[in-house]
Amino acid sequence: MTLFRGPLLAAVVALLAACAPAAWAPAEEGAIQLPPGFRMDTFASGLGAPRFMAVSPSGDLFVSVPSRGQIVALPDRDGRGKAERAIIFADGLKRPHGLAFFRGFLYVAETGAVVRFPYRPGDLTGGKPEVVVRDLPGGGGHWTRTITFGPGGKMYVSVGSSCNVCEERDPRRAAILQFEPDGSGGRLFARGIRNAVGITFHPGTGELWATDNGRDWLGDDFPPDRILVVKEGAHYGWPYCNGRRVPDPDLGRPDFCKTTALPAVEIQAHSAPLGLTFYTGGMFPAEYRGDLFVGLHGSWNRSVQTGYKIIRIPMRGGTPGVPEDFATGWLQGSQAWGRPVDVITGKDGALYVSDDRAGRIYRIAYSTR
């Protein structure tokens, strides 16, 4: 066995320290900075590592907790802005992540399958799930699977790559798949998307938008993470290209890169954009309506940490503007007390944010008082 000694050991320790997520710090909810008139409060806590959310037809908030194999319902029936209790809707699932309510069912994307639970308005506990997709590719990295439904009633599932950078053996990796709601008719919808953790449809144009996490180990500032408008049949570059058609140093194919689809928005490298939502509520000022909000989970392999915040991308006529900070303060120096994951508009018009480090769901509201 080879032992690390002297300067080599010091170098290895320094590298590992630089590549770790920001260190844990005690929660400081009051440290969050928001635009004037906005306020953030804890909606629910003690959830372990909550990830993706969905709002039921009754207005109840549901969240996945993959580490516990659970889907949790968080009703706020009295409308006071706090979950009255946390109710386990489903348990014993295999790393459930994405959630979607559609035509009398709650669909759940597990790491290797899609299941659905019968749902009636007001339900807070689920029955026996039905498996609708049995064979999503698994193994390797990027285990999350996210699900949404399009205006035409099709089901879309994002599947990340199995690696940092490689040529996949299974074409369903680093892709978005399309199915009928019953799981039939599965096919590739778009490719070359390294890890689209978040997917959603634009409420006005009907276009599919996605976050995409770029590859690692090319420095602090490259490649950028991306927001994509996902077109049917398009290829978005990975693993051959990064950013805006820049050939990869390991697997680059310059001629092919010229044919790939361009991103709609680029974000600071290693920010780790996860959930995204177009604001459709009536609580925020008019200038926020229709804008895109994105949760940046935060870097783990950058010498100076970045992310750990919520950004707003103004939308004008369906065209994205320059990203701007909306909620910051989870990162304090080199310490982070939380990591934002998903963002969603609640029935009350507030913006809800999940945090898988602090184990909380936050509620961001606006008031002129």
Q: Residue spans of the language-model regions?
A:
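Acidic, glycine-anchored loop motifs typical of Ca2+
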Residues: G79-R85, G122-L124
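Bacterial N-terminal signal peptides
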Residues: P7-A18
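Surface loop/turn motifs at the tips and blade-to-blade linkers of beta-strand repeat domains
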Residues: T42-L47, I87-G92, V132-G139, L188-G192, ...
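Beta-strand-rich domains and repeat architectures in extracellular enzymes and scaffolds
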Residues: D41-S67, A272-F278, V294-G295
